[in-house]
Amino acid sequence: MNKQSWLLNLSLLKTHPAFRAVFLARFISIVSLGLLGVAVPVQIQMMTHSTWQVGLSVTLTGGAMFVGLMVGGVLADRYERKKVILLARGTCGIGFIGLCLNALLPEPSLLAIYLLGLWDGFFASLGVTALLAATPALVGRENLMQAGAITMLTVRLGSVISPMIGGLLLATGGVAWNYGLAAAGTFITLLPLLSLPALPPPPQPREHPLKSLLAGFRFLLASPLVGGIALLGGLLTMASAVRVLYPALADNWQMSAAQIGFLYAAIPLGAAIGALTSGKLAHSARPGLLMLLSTLGSFLAIGLFGLMPMWILGVVCLALFGWLSAVSSLLQYTMLQTQTPEAMLGRINGLWTAQNVTGDAIGAALLGGLGAMMTPVASASASGFGLLIIGVLLLLVLVELRHFRQTPPQVTASDS
C-alpha cells in the first residue's frame, strides 16, 4: 500500500503475530459479550416485567466495570500483564457459566444474575486495562495508530454481528444458549492469548495499591497534555449519549420503525469509515490540533443533528459525528500511549477508559434532564452547542496540546 493512502493498512495482522492473536481474541470476546448484552436485559424483563430492574442491572455492571478498570490499571503496572489478561478472561468465563446454569434452573435467581453481573463487569474490565497497557510492547509505539484503527474496526464489526446472533439465539433456544456460547467464546479466546510473549511490567518501587492509583491521578492532573486528552475524551463520550433522544426525535420526524434503525446505525457506520480512512493520521505533524478540531466538529454535528428538517439529514449529521469522533478517538489513543511513561500505562489506560464509561452515563443523565424541560430538538441542539462552547474554550486553554508536534513515523517497505 502506498504510504500516502488514506486507507487503513492491515499489514500489522501479517507482520505481528502477537497482535494478530489479540485481534482474534478481541473479536471473539466482543461477539461473546454481545450475546450476553442481549440476554441479560431480556431475561430480567421476562422475570420481573420491570424496566427499573433492567436498568439496575446495567448500573451495577457499569459500577463493577469502573472499579475493575481502576484495579486493573494498578495490577497491570505491578504484575506480569499476560498473566493478568489470562486470569481476567478465565475468571470472566466462569461467571458466564454461572449465568448459563442459573438460566437452566426451573426458577432462575434474580439475585444471582445481579451478582454474576458484578463479577463479570469487574473481571472483564480488569483484563481490558492490562491489554491496553500491553499493546505498545506488542506492536511498537510507532504502530499504535494503525493498531488502534484495526481495533476500532474489530469493535464496530463485532458490535453489529453479535446482537443479531444473540437475537436469533433468543428466538430459537432461549437465554441459556446465549450464556453458554458466551462462556465458550470467552474460553476460546484463551487459546490465541496463550501464544502472547511474556509482558512484564516496568521495574518500579512497591507501594500500596491506593497510593499507586493516586499517583496515576496526580500524573493525569499534572500533565497538561495527557490530562487534556482525557478531558476531551470524556466530553466526546458525553456527546455520544445523544442516542437516548432517538425515539423522541423519531416521533418528531414521523419515522417508521424500520427507519429508526438508521439513526442507531449512523454513528457506528461513520466511525467505521473514520477507521478505514485513517491511513494518514499517524503522519500528522500536529495531532493535538487535529484532535481538538475534529472534536469541535463532532460537537457541531450533534448541535445541527436535531435541527435538521428531514430525518435523512439527521442521519448524515450522526454519520459525520461518528467519523469525526473516530478521528479524535484514534488520536487520543495514540497520544495517550506515546506520551505516558511505561510505568504508568496501566493506570492511565484504566482512568482513560473509566472516563469513557462515566462520560456516557453523565451525558445520558444530562440529556434525560434536558428532555424533561425542553423539546427533544432543543435538548439535542443544546447539548451539542453547549459542548461546542466548552470545546472552543479548551482550544484556547490547552495550549500545550494545541501546539504539540511530533515527528511522523518512518514507513518501511513492508508498510507500503
Curated annotation (Swiss-Prot):
Membrane topology: Multi-pass membrane protein
UniProt xrefs under Pfam families: MFS_3 (PF05977)
NCBIfam families per the UniProt record, alphabetical: PRK10489.1 (NF007792)
Effect of loss of the gene: Mutant is unable to secrete enterobactin efficiently. It secretes little, if any, enterobactin, but elevated levels of enterobactin breakdown products 2,3-dihydroxybenzoylserine (DHBS) monomer, dimer and trimer.
MF annotations from Gene Ontology: efflux transmembrane transporter activity; enterobactin transmembrane transporter activity
TM region positions: 22-42, 56-76, 84-104, 110-130, 157-177, 179-199, 219-239, 257-277, 288-307, 314-336, 357-377, 379-399
Family of the protein in this entry: Belongs to the major facilitator superfamily. EntS (TC 2.A.1.38) family.
Gene name in the database record: entS
Cytoplasmic compartment segments: 1-21, 77-83, 131-156, 200-218, 278-287, 337-356, 400-416
A single GO BP: enterobactin transport
Cellular component terms (Gene Ontology): plasma membrane
Intracellular or extracellular location(s): Cell inner membrane
Main location: membrane
InterPro entries according to UniProt: Enterobactin_exp_EntS, MFS_dom, MFS_trans_sf, TM_effector
Classification via Gene3D superfamilies: MFS general substrate transporter like domains (1.20.1250.20)
Keyword set, alphabetical order: Cell inner membrane, Cell membrane, Membrane, Transmembrane, Transmembrane helix, Transport
Role this protein plays: Component of an export pathway for enterobactin. Overexpression reduces intracellular arabinose concentrations.
The protein's name: Enterobactin exporter EntS
Ranges per topology, Periplasmic: 43-55, 105-109, 178, 240-256, 308-313, 378
